[in-house]
Every structure is written in C-alpha cells, then in structure tokens.
Amino acid sequence: MISSEQAKQLYADRFEKDKKQSSKGGWHSDITFEPVPSDYAILRLTELPPTGGDTLWASGYEVYDRLSPAYQSFLESLTATYAQPIFNESAEKNGFQIYSAERGSPENVGSDLKAVHPVVRTNPVTGWKSIFAVGHHAKRINEVTEAESQHLLQWFVQLIVENHDLQVRYRWQNPNDVAIWDNRSVYHTATYDYDGVRTGQRAVSLGEKPYLDPESTSRREALEKAKSR
C-alpha cells in the first residue's frame, strides 16, 4: 500500500524538517536492494490530495546515452551495492520485523535488504543498456573510493534533475488511473508538494538477477540502426 499517512508515522524524521530545499533524493527503482529485484510495477492511487502529488518517471536508457563512450565503458566495468537500512531502522522504531522468508524469489530472503548488481544493466526485453545504480537504494559503487562513489551516484541523479526531456510527469486524475512501468530501465519519484491524503496500491513483479550483456547496445544505437535499414 502507498499511504502518505503511514509514511508520516514510519518515517517521521523525513517530515519534521522546516524547509524542503531538495526532493532529488526521492528518485529510485523499486526494491533494487533485493538479489532478484522488480521488473514491472503497477500503481493506482485511490485517494488523491486536492492538488499536487504527481509522479515523475525518468529514462535510464537516456541517462546512459548522454554519456561519452569512454565513460560508458568505464561504468560498465563497475558494480554497486544496493541497500535500504532505513526500512530496518523504521521496523525497529515501530515495533515490527522485516519479513525474512522468501519475498517472491528463493534468493530474496533474510532481513539484510542488501545486494550487489551492475552499475550498467541490460534490459532483456529490449536488449538496451541503462544506468541502473540510481536513487536512494544505490549506496556504494564498489570498485572506486568512497569520494568517487558519492560523486558518481550524485552525478547520475543530477543528470536526471537537470534534463527534463528525459522525464515524464503524470498528474493523477481519478481512482481509475493506472500506471505501469519497467523498473529495469526506468526510475520514478513522487512529487511531495501536497498537504492532503495520498493513498493507493502498488504491486511489483520480479524479473531476473540484473546483468550486463556485453553484446547489448544502447537505445540510441538501436534506433539509428533501425533508421538506416
């Protein structure tokens, strides 16, 4: 369930700040801290605030395509650690435990909520590469220093927020609106500009363990080849 009221209870620290000066930390792909994370997600909001609360999505294909070939090759050699310690902290503060049995896959067990995946991932449906290590689940680029890791993770988000043409924004109109997206190559965030209640249901399916196919291509390369035929 997606609930603004539940979020205020579970993550009270988030809502106690006087002035909100940046919302870029909201960008993420769903449950990338699992060894087998989500492929598709479905979201329906059944209770909407009077104004605000839009959802934004951004293209991981396009983030990858905006990098130089040299940087693309460098990032393809890296892995990242994905984790969500805030969930465990919230569970401890609020007196419940993280579900530690199989969460949709035999590999998604335990309460650590931590996994290692490539920085650049191939989408098995399209065969295109995208930057995967984006958002608040991506904690550390493993093969570089801490300073270099933070620089890269912040830069990936910066590429999203400074390029509106790789984003799409949806204004929820009524309880029958449904959004479906592919977490393997798309990031999303809510827009926290509302005061009313925002409630809904989200379901995710599980895909495969993220991988990089060295024979895969970029979206831009694939479209250029299609044009030349």
Residue ranges and their predicted role:
Residues 1-180, 184-229:
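Fe(II)/2-oxoglutarate oxygenase catalytic core
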